[in-house]
Amino acid sequence: MAEQRILFVCLGNICRSPAAEGVFLHLIAREGLEDQFVVDSAGTGGWHVGNPADRRMRAAAERRGIHLPSRARQIELADFTSFDRILTMDDDNLRNVKALGRELGNRPGLARVEPMTSYCRQHSATHVPDPYYGGEQGFKDVLDLLEDACGGLLETLLRSP
């Protein structure tokens, strides 16, 4: 399998997308596939650039043995040519990412933009809810959803040529 380049995107890049990045990195490390993937995360907004993931999300992930290594950054046009897939957490993220990508036109070689939940195997959610303004349970629920979706994504990528 050729190296796959995956970018996870949410609003501020401090809760959902760094959690998705961390979960996916955890899964590929467990399978010994680190050399087959480039994984990153970004936000559609730039408010938190340079900051680590939200402390509550980091704590919830650490309880599952998942490390969240990234620092917040904002998605940029170069990401559409640097990554194979861009996975968004909700409809607003999807709409904003697609709008940004339209600036590059419809040329070949651009990243495929998809909702993260399209890879869920057990959950029927249509979006990954933002836990930022909620309590501890919201962070746990997001991690449950992301573990499901990241597992489905990995299965799909390993099956594709």
Please report, for each region that a protein language model flagged, where it lies by residue.
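Conserved active-site segments centered on acidic
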Residues: 1-83, 155-161
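Phosphate-binding/catalytic loops
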Residues: 82-85, 91-161
